């Protein structure tokens, strides 16, 4: 027989969005923001410890607006950028009214914009006085974050803990104070802890430097 599809919701009206911006200045600032993201990548590559980040270049850097929407990115790993904004918005949602200058957050939760657990995201707000203007964020593939097997994320996992350490909304830097001991505790205090927390910490330091 025939399958008949009947629309029950009105088709959304699509209107072209105009702009009064100077196209020259728009392009200038577009390239300025992209250049910042590229410089973030150079810093991350040059200061990271792991081969994954330093040589394989398995990372991405980007700039987001105060609401977590993507403004500009460098041509790193496009697969990271599709969901990184959700990670920024998760940080905003979970810390509403509590984010301050000098703070940075870490997460790899796939339920909040993460990809697989080895991809760890560091999110840092950019303030002017008391107002958040932007967020800068970078995501890097750490060689190991625990799990049943070295390298993390084994395909036969039946539960998220078997893939590695799940990090959600952890404040890595609190008003300029780097919380290394607490971060090590997160990496080690798990059913399947990270096998080389020292390397994880070194790469997280590089991500902070990039931001």
Report residues per predicted region.
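Terminal amphipathic helices with adjacent charged low-complexity linkers/tails
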Residues: 1-18
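Cysteine/selenocysteine-centered motifs that mediate thiol-based redox chemistry or coordinate metal-sulfur cofactors
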Residues: 31-34, 38-45, 99-122, 126, ...
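Alpha/propeptide regions of enzymes that mature by internal proteolysis
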Residues: 28-50, 57-117, 131-135, 199-201, ...
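Residue-level structural signal for beta-strand termini and adjacent loop
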Residues: 9, 76, 138-139
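Gly-rich Lys/Arg/Thr-decorated short loops/hinges at beta-loop-alpha junctions or inter-strand turns
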Residues: 13-24, 69-72, 192-195
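Mobile "lid/hinge" segments at catalytic clefts and subdomain interfaces of large enzymes
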Residues: 129-211
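Short, Lys/Arg- and Gly-enriched loop/turn segments at beta-strand edges
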Residues: 12-16, 113-119, 145-146
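Core beta-strand residues in small-molecule sensory/regulatory alpha/beta domains
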Residues: 64-65, 123-127, 139
